[in-house]
Amino acid sequence: MNFLLSDLSLNALPTLWLTLAETATKTAADVVSVNPLKGPVEYVATFLFALAILHTFVVKQFAKLAHKYPEGSIMENLFHFLAETEIVFGIWAAVLFLTIGVMKLSVQSAVDYIEGLNFTEPKFVLVVMVVAATRPVVNLAETIILFLARLLPLKETVSFYIAALSFGALFGSFITEPAAMTLLALLLKRRYFDQGISKTLAYATIGLLFVNVSIGGTLTHFAAPPVLMVAGKWGWGTWHMASNFGWRAVASCLCSTLLVVLCFWKQLNSLEVDKTEQQKVPGWLTGLHLMFLATIVALAHHPDVFFGVFMMFLGLVTATKEYQDPLKLKEGLLVGFFLAGLVTMGSLQEHWLRPLIANESMTGLKMYFGATALTAITDNAALTYLGSLVEGISDQLKYALVAGAVTGGGLTVIANAPNPAGAGILQSSKAFEGTGISPVGLLLGAIPPTLMAIVFFWFVAR
């Protein structure tokens, strides 16, 4: 297997991951922007944020409206533009920019606000998505998952599904959640979403994928954004995460996946085994790709540096194009734009989120289920960051906040930073018939694995 030829690079990964762990324990204030605007602007921003969320639920209606107009007409193109999920928050962020300028009677105020934000996460997701989607990395991930799948005495279409969505989701604890999401989405698209599966199975699978990736990053303290926001301040290390969160994530991922497999056994078992042979990639090239990926992950909070590494990586890809597939640059840019819009709008939501978290009557139960629900309408990393600002919060509330944030991370596209990457890859698959991913369908598909996560993260052995 190709990955066995890359021992040198693989042996170097633990050191790089240790570097990442040290880098990632910076205070949350270093990686989240501070809101300089107060008062009426915040309320208008919340109203626009609500409109943006509503927009994500009606993109399919805009797509239908586009078909009512002549092809190439202004209205047809306008409605197609509004139907693109990845640009929703970017559109409303632009409206917010103009609104700030008007309300402050100064374009400079709007410019200062944008320049005061921290767009490191969108940049990182863009870069890591492109690197993780390259042929050498995808082939390696597929080889590992296939190895695990063949340990199960089941047809490959069933065993690969189990291995990918249970054990594969845990990759996010080591290579970061965006990278794991990208790899799994690409593999699932080719093996399942483009193979004529029903829409019901498609939504059950994407819901399972989003939830499992969200909780699957909790085995370590440096890979899941909502954990990263609090780990440094609260002194949480990898042992703390593995012993309090990680084992629950493993159990929940496995049980949720087995539940979906049982519900769709007949359909999964009837699929044709993927006969596509991996295009050969030299071991040394796979090793170099892993080295670049690990370096980018280790430098996740230094965008100027990891972008330089990314430029070098693009040079490597160009020089070895005979072993490469087309880069996912457009997809990465769209996902980065989505997250940048979310950062722009989400940074002005502290005025209503923080009081909810800091409420003196807050109990562990309220915090857990409140965080799970709130995560559906706001990025879970922003939620845990705001919680880290509350002084004197008890250990029970700390656990409840983070556990709730990761539990609800699969309910919507905006709930967890890696979700737009998965949605961007899967929405063009045959399973969705060119209509994109329905937010309602995603929500319904994510509810069963979310309930399973609730069982393990809140009710089991606490």
Predicted regions and their residues:
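Juxtamembrane and boundary regions of transmembrane helices in multi-pass small-molecule transporters
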Residues: 1-3, 41-68, 140, 200-203, ...
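Short, strongly hydrophobic alpha-helical membrane anchors
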Residues: 1-39
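Interfacial loop-to-helix junctions that mark the boundaries of transmembrane helices
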Residues: 30-42, 78-86, 107-123, 238-248, ...
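Hydrophobic mid-bilayer segments of alpha-helices in multi-pass membrane transport proteins
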Residues: 43-64, 84-102, 118-132, 183, ...
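Low-complexity, highly charged intrinsically disordered N-terminal segments
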Residues: 79-148, 152-160
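Transmembrane helical segments that form the transport core of multi-pass membrane transport proteins
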Residues: 103-115, 138, 142, 289-393
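Helix-loop-helix module between adjacent transmembrane segments
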Residues: 130-135, 155-156, 167-179, 211-220, ...
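Hydrophobic transmembrane alpha-helices that form the pore/transport pathway of multi-pass ion
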Residues: 153, 159-215, 229, 385-403, ...
